[in-house]
């Protein structure tokens, strides 16, 4: 797999940066140069800061949770001074406990020694989304990527949530979405990941995913919710990073994203930020609709243990 980016800009208050110390240490252990930009008043314009750099590979803004993904960042990618595109991510500071949980999760993913390429294909049980999932599975197979098809026709919600605890590097959902979660699987909400349904056993140890991409409408929107689904996943420790839309999206744009993501993973993209840079469609609306949440350098490699756990997941198809 390709080498990870090596220069990260972290914009945060001193209190937030202190809560992320475990992740900062993990970045530095992975030879990432972490540049800290502290602020105390207004949230800085991260896109402008990135535009002043020539060598920056990624940026993460951590600011107060009263800000929303759709207004605090303009897009998941911005250009630095030399014209190269750089992934920028957002993380809401709601409380130190959730930041500590995120930092521990992202640090764990950073320290994993996974070098296998694998993806969990998730999707709503509707023909157009199942066709996209089948196309992604074919692209993954052609590119030497192990694809696990855990779509709504093949697995129940509770089994899918349990399967995502195997620790694969990447999960990719296609279907309808809402600010509170996925419409597929009879509705998936953030609380389902830590509140198992009565009478259903769940694996005792969950391993976080590298990144979960929701290629659908509004999962990063704050409309009528205190915290969007895309923001909740990293804060709950489900994944080191997530990717979701702040508004409505076009099925054609989401399909282009899906195809691009599978092609980029097959071509060797090793972090979620690198994946998005390689996979981004040419359409400005396809890019500007989405936001990256969490660690922009989250590794996408899967280790052998996680791969074996995923292979044991039972499906109906």
Question: Where on the chain are the PLM-derived regions?
Answer:
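Extracellular/periplasmic Venus flytrap/periplasmic-binding protein
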Residues: 126-166
